[in-house]
Swiss-Prot record:
Catalytic activity: Preferential cleavage of polypeptides between hydrophobic residues, particularly with Phe or Tyr at P1'
Protein name: Neprilysin-2
Organism: Drosophila melanogaster
Chain's gene name: Nep2
The entry's keywords: Cell membrane, Disulfide bond, Glycoprotein, Hydrolase, Membrane, Metal-binding, Metalloprotease, Protease, Secreted, Signal-anchor, Transmembrane, Transmembrane helix, Zinc
Chain segments annotated as transmembrane: 21-41
Glycosylation sites: N173, N239, N264, N305, N315, N358, N554, N653
Topological domains annotated Cytoplasmic: 1-20
């Protein structure tokens, strides 16, 4: 249930639309107050293009699961007398109407129909690269987190609740940050051997420098270890109860998709200019910086060119290549592997002779040896030190941050830096993915504990779990109905489906002070040392992750699911689990006090999406226990791949107008399969709920059937506006289709959508040829 802050002065908090709808009571077509009246009058005078009679549903009595209405249900959802006039229904109607453009024919472009006014009237703030249904909730959540973090916490309070406050204060101390200038990073860099570009000819005078030793020093100091070789502790894909060392291709500062194009790509040019300008701010000679950093950039381009593209990394079996230390040494002798790995592991952990190490992309390591052999040490060192200096810029004084903003503008279109308090809230609550495993969330666990205690209603867990079970049952029945699966594969799919663990809201352990105290025992933050404290957090997180190497994987570990204050949802192939944090169980996505068609169209869609991820092109590679295993009969797999190919080609043929770019059907196929399956499953689940509980009332001012409103809620889930630069990046590097195509692609494949809106066969939203995986 959405958190509602009680306020006796309720009327003053209503907007004009809500006041008008309330005063009008049962009147479906209302006239709003000045400023909004003409627009809404137009909306309310415009009948939907088709107004079919809804299917009669069983039962007309109000149950505890139904929203109370202003009039008794007559048992026919198309009856305009059934209107919900509660406070929450009026607010919901207002929100829906502000986004819709009902004069658009839904069978032509449902995204414009559901989100057209939102797209025309909403403006992207200068400090953002996009706005969306998600960002509205995230902004509200950010303000709630600010209140939590800025609250005074005396020394008597547990340390784990004071740590976020200390980091926030360090971040907000702009006076000290400006006074220090570049000193925080230059002091550390000098201790690490110095940036050759800055040190000049005195660098490496004894010719003893090696990139391996530099990586070890970076690890000790709290920087990333992944600039040459990505080193992490992961889960054994074929035995997900064990952990192992995972070696992968290097982490790049600019996406591979851009770097491989060289200077033909404008963003590569922007990146190069940024490198040079930042180096000059640190004291480098500009001409020398241009020369030396060009060589370093060419080295990074070479790293990109020997790396695998995302399209090739979707097959997990291709990324699973176990080697012993001896095999590594024989194949890639340019690194003393045992010494290298031991130096990166925490004290007390050492690589055994029979240790099985996963080499994600063997061809990368073969090519890397050749690249390193022909690249001068100074070029490699300049590149590595550029990376840590580039990482540090956001923690430094304003002259550095202004140049960073210019680069961000080229990259994503952002026009201004966000308010300092927003940045500091994010720093104090978010994980650093660059150096920490996914199950480490810096101070987000501490802040999340305070957040759920103050803002999350426990009833929301039960409501969401009920929907999960209903939608899971629908997927089970879909498996029964598909005619392209053999019986054995279908049985395994059902077993995987019903074994899928569900994590909703937050783990109870988050509220246990003893567990929190133990988790944060080794972490300290100095409010007068912002950058150093952040590096300390990185060391803490890396040690936490690496110390798990010899420990069995606990798939229900509370720490892995202790990220409640985010607006997102997750599926884990290795856990075979779905997760819905507290942050998404509110706002557009869920409210127990509004009609169910709105909840099924929003959070129900998300639930179905995450369940379906277990059976998308990547999730299907893992079995019921989360192990990488081929459990598909060859004929069934062939049929699946043909269906997935239809999705790939459908989305790959979409062209985004603003950028002129075609979508990447391969990289987005997993999300697209999940969208298509998720909305179908949730729709069927809603129809079953309605058959059991009877018809639901309409929302005031919205003369649509409950089924049509389900689709409106689903479409408005993806209302979003992007800056052109951000959209280009999303299409080029992302796994999600732009919002417009998430709606058009999935709903145009739905026969029920076409039926509910009476779309003629062959219309844009009811093509003759449809794609369907599940």
């Amino acid at each position: 249930m959405q958190t509602v802050i009680q306020n006796p002065n309720w009327w003053r908090r209503r907007n004009k639309l809500e006041k008008s709808l309330l005063v009008s009571l049962g009147i479906m077509f209302v006239v709003l107050a000045t400023g909004f009246g003409l627009w809404i009058g137009k909306v309310l005078r415009t009948s939907p293009p088709s107004n079919p009679q809804a299917t009669a549903l069983h039962g007309d009595s109000t149950t505890i699961n139904q929203v109370p209405t202003g009039t008794a249900s007559k048992g026919k959802s198309g009856d305009s007398g059934d209107v919900c006039l509660t406070q929450e229904c009026i607010h919901t109607a207002s929100t829906v109407l502000r986004k819709m453009k009902p004069e658009v024919e839904p069978c032509d472009n449902f995204y414009e129909f559901a989100c057209g006014t939102y797209l025309e009237e909403e403006n992207i703030p200068d400090d953002k690269v996009s706005i969306s249904t998600f960002s509205v909730i995230s902004d509200k959540l950010q303000e709630q987190l600010k209140d939590i973090i800025t609250a005074e916490r005396p020394e008597t309070e547990p340390k784990h609740f004071r740590l976020p406050n200390l980091l926030y204060k360090a971040c907000m101390n702009k006076t000290l940050i400006e006074t220090l200038g570049p000193e925080p990073i230059t002091r550390v860099a000098e201790r690490l051997g110095g940036w050759p570009l800055i040190k000049g000819d005195s660098w490496n005078a004894d010719d003893s420098w090696t990139w391996q030793e530099q990586v070890k020093k970076f690890r000790t100091a709290g920087f990333s270890m992944d600039y040459i070789i990505d080193f992490s502790i992961g889960v054994d894909l074929q035995n997900s109860t064990k952990r192992l060392i995972d070696l992968d291709q290097s982490s790049l500062a600019l996406s591979r998709e851009y770097l491989v194009k060289g200077f033909n790509e404008t963003l590569v040019t922007a990146y190069y200019k940024y490198m040079v300008d930042i180096a000059v701010l640190f004291g480098a000679n500009r001409d020398l910086a241009k020369t030396e950093l060009l060589l370093s950039l060419e080295f990074e381009m070479a790293l990109a060119n020997i790396s695998w593209p995302n399209e090739k990394r979707r097959n997990s079996s291709e990324l699973y290549n176990l080697r012993t230390p001896a095999q590594l040494q024989a194949a890639y002798p340019y690194v003393q592997w045992v010494d290298y790995m031991n130096a990166l592991l925490p004290e007390g952990l050492n690589v055994a002779e029979d240790e099985m190490i996963n080499l994600s992309v063997p061809s990368f390591f073969e090519d890397l040896g050749k690249l390193l052999a022909k690249t001068p040490k100074r070029v490699i060192a300049n590149y590595m030190f550029w990376r840590i200096h580039g990482f540090s810029v956001g923690f430094l004084s304003e002259e550095f941050r202004k140049r960073q903003l210019q680069y961000a503008t080229a990259l994503s279109g952002r026009q201004e830096q966000e308010a300092r308090w927003k940045e500091c809230v994010d720093i104090a609550t978010s994980s650093m993915d660059e150096v920490c495993e996914d199950d480490f969330d810096s101070l987000g666990i501490s802040v999340g504990s305070l957040y759920v205690g103050k803002h999350f209603h426990k009833d929301s867990k039960a409501n969401a779990l009920e929907m999960v079970n209903e939608i899971r049952n629908v997927f089970n029945d879909i498996l029964d109905e598909v005619n392209w699966m053999d019986a054995k594969t279908k049985k395994e799919a059902k077993l995987k489906l019903h074994s899928m663990a569900t994590h909703i809201g937050y783990p109870d352990e988050m509220l246990d002070n003893e567990k929190l105290a133990a988790y944060y025992a080794k972490l300290d933050i100095d409010p007068d040392k912002y950058f150093e404290s952040f590096l300390g957090m990185n060391i803490f997180g890396t040690d936490y992750s690496f110390n798990k190497l010899r420990l069995p994987v606990n798939k229900t570990d509370w720490v892995r699911h202790a990220r409640p204050a985010i607006v997102n949802a997750f599926y884990s192939s290795l856990e075979n689990s779905i997760q819905f944090p507290a942050g998404i169980l509110q706002g557009h996505f869920f409210n127990a006090q509004r009609p169910k068609y709105m909840n099924f169209g929003a959070i129900g869609y998300v639930i179905g999406h995450e369940i379906t991820h277990g059976f998308d092109d990547q999730g299907r590679q893992f079995d019921v226990k989360g192990n990488l295993r081929d459990w598909w009969h060859p004929d069934t797999q062939k049929a699946y791949l043909a269906k997935a190919k239809c999705i790939i080609e459908q989305y790959g043929n979409y062209t985004e107008r603003a950028t002129g770019l075609n979508l990447n059907g391969i990289n987005t196929q997993g999300e697209n399969i999940a969208d298509n399956g998720g909305v179908k499953e949730s729709y069927i689940a809603y129809r079953r709920w309605a058959e059991k509980h009877g018809p639901e009332a309409k929302l005031p001012g919205l003369d649509y059937t409950p089924e049509q409103m389900f689709w409106v809620a689903a479409g408005q889930t993806w209302c979003a506006k992007y800056r052109k630069e951000s959209l280009k990046m999303r299409i080029t590097t992302g796994v999600h289709s732009p919002s417009e195509f998430r709606v058009l692609g999935s709903l145009s494949n739905m026969k029920d959508f076409a039926k509910d809106f009476h779309c003629p066969e062959g219309s844009p939203m009811n093509p003759v040829q449809k794609c369907e995986v599940w």
